[in-house]
Every structure is written in structure tokens, then in C-alpha cells.
Amino acid sequence: MSPTSPTDTTTPLWKRMLRRRLKFLAWRVALLAIVLGGSYLFAPQWLMRAGHLREAMAAKLETHSVQVGDTRWSYYEGGEGPTIVLLHGFAGDKDVWLPVAALLSAHFHLVIPDLPGWGESSRVAQGNYDVDAQAARLDAFVQALRLPRFMLAGHGTGAAIAAAYAADQPQRVAGLALLDAYGLKAGESDLTRLVRAGNNPYLFGDRAGYAQLAALEFAQPPDRPGRFVDVLVERNRRDRDFIQRTFQAWHAQPLALQQRLGRLTMPVLGLWCHDDRITDISALDSLRNGLTAASAISTSTINGCGHLPMLEKPETTAQILTGFALSH
């Protein structure tokens, strides 16, 4: 018969049970730390994706996919109320809208796609991804989802795509929101000066290159963990040829939005970050002056952000979009 320790006989049962449970929890915490640490070092892309999925769940969004024409579209969808479709900008993806989506989904039905060629949507080798081709794909996507009349919002080059679609399909668009839009007459920006000097910041092969782009896009660049930056660097290297080819195609259409302004008949919102170094804020004047047929024109500027208001100022951005959507 094994001797019984004094502790076993004198310690109350509930304390012994608690001690065992705490030991079990300590082992679980240690194991979780090992798994997360290993994932950060060896599979940071999984941690990044898991973080985005958590954000999407918090915003009551689900991930879907649908084959339409030459593209397998990946998109978020969720929320209840009037429909808003949100389009990301150049070399971006649907995840940039998540901070704003968390504030909109309680009042609106959101559809947030990865535009063809970007994110998790498919890409056709040597395919055309300029404004006209993307607007045509967007039309097919909207029809496939059988969306009712909706508000359409686009950022950067996504704004030019949104405007091209709205100009061709005005009966489908209840309102058009253009955020830091590409394709308008504007003063020279830091981006245009770099490109003219032969330096395209959207092409980078190391952390320093990413930091240069982040400094252009953000007033206060986010403090990303190094291994997460490495994921973005590797992705950029992998997509380098596509990014370069698509950038050149868009660079050849500097007034892709300007030339369509007179055909926009729905209410239009122009929203700009005051410190945008990608597209100078003077473009907002071109937008205002060119909207000769719009039924209503609203403009807003946000201080303290660069080119990405939905990431740097999500609360203000969501408030402005909500006000615009509810007033039209």
C-alpha cells in the first residue's frame, strides 16, 4: 500500500481540484504560446489570415466565393439593411474595409469583394485589368449576386472602377462614394514625383521598400510585426510582374474618372484625407467641378490620415458613409 502524503490528507478536496485545474490551464497556455510563437516564426501568413477572419466575424461578415465569367470572386457579405458595395484600391484587398465594416454592418447589408486579380479572387494570366475591364467584371458580379439597387463606394483605383460602372449602369446605383479617388486632374503628389523619377513604390522586395510605401499611404504608418511585413514582401515579390503590368495600364489612364464625371447622375460623395500623398487633395476640386449632372454632391475631408481613411480613421469614415447613405 502506497504511503499517503500529508498534503493529500490535509488539503481540502476543492483545493486539490483547483490546483489540478490550474496546472492543466497552465499547460494549455504554454502549449498555445508555443503554437502561436511557432506560427509567427514559420507561418505568419496563417496568423494574419486568422486575424482578418476574426475581424470579419466580429463585423458579422461571412466569406463567400462565386465563379462569374473568367473570375472566381472572393467576397465578404453580411449585415442587414440597404446594400452597400465596397471596392478596394490598387494592390489592395477586401480586408482593408474590415474596420469600417464593423461599424456599418449593424445598419447595412455589405458586399465587399476582392477585385479580380487581387486578394483571394482569381487572376487570368496576361488578362486585362484596366478600368473598363474591371467595370465590366463588376457588372457581371453584381448580376450574378442579383443585388438590388445599392450604394457603391470605391477607394483609389476602386473609385475609378465604381464610377465607370455607375456611369454605365446608373439605374443600379443609388449613390456613389469616391474615397481618395484615382483618375482626376490633380496637383503633383509624392507618388507621381517618385514614378516620374523611375521609382514605383508599389514594387518592393524587402522591409525597407514596404516602409517606403507605408510612409506614402499612411499619415501614421501602422507598427506591423516584422514577420507580417515579410508576408507582404513575399506576396509583392510573387505578384511583381502583375503589379507592374497593371500599374502601367492604369498609369496610361490618368483621367479614367475625370472623363466620366459628366455622366454620373446619382448623388455623389467625394471623401479625401487631407494629407494624401498618393493622390493630391486638389483632385477634390476637379471632382466637384466636373459633376455637372449629379443629382446631389457632397464632399468631406478628414484630417490626420494619408491615402487610407478606412484604416486610419474608420470611425469618421463610417460616420460620413452612413450619413451619405441614409440621406439618399
Question: Which ranges hold each PLM region?
Answer:
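Active-site loop/oxyanion-hole signature of alpha/beta-hydrolase fold enzymes
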Residues: 68-69, 74-78, 112-153
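Flexible "cap/lid" loop of the alpha/beta hydrolase fold
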Residues: 163, 167, 174-205
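Conserved HGGG/HGGXW glycine-rich cap/lid loop of the alpha/beta-hydrolase fold
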Residues: 76-120
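Conserved alpha/beta-hydrolase "acid-adjacent" motif
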Residues: 277-283
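Catalytic active-site module of serine/aspartate enzymes centered on a nucleophile-bearing elbow/loop
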Residues: 294-328
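Conserved alpha/beta-hydrolase catalytic His-Asp/Glu region
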Residues: 45-47, 54, 187-193, 203-263
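Short beta-strand/loop motif that positions the catalytic acidic residue
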Residues: 264, 270-272, 276
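Alpha/beta-hydrolase fold catalytic core
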Residues: 1-82, 107-108, 148, 326-328
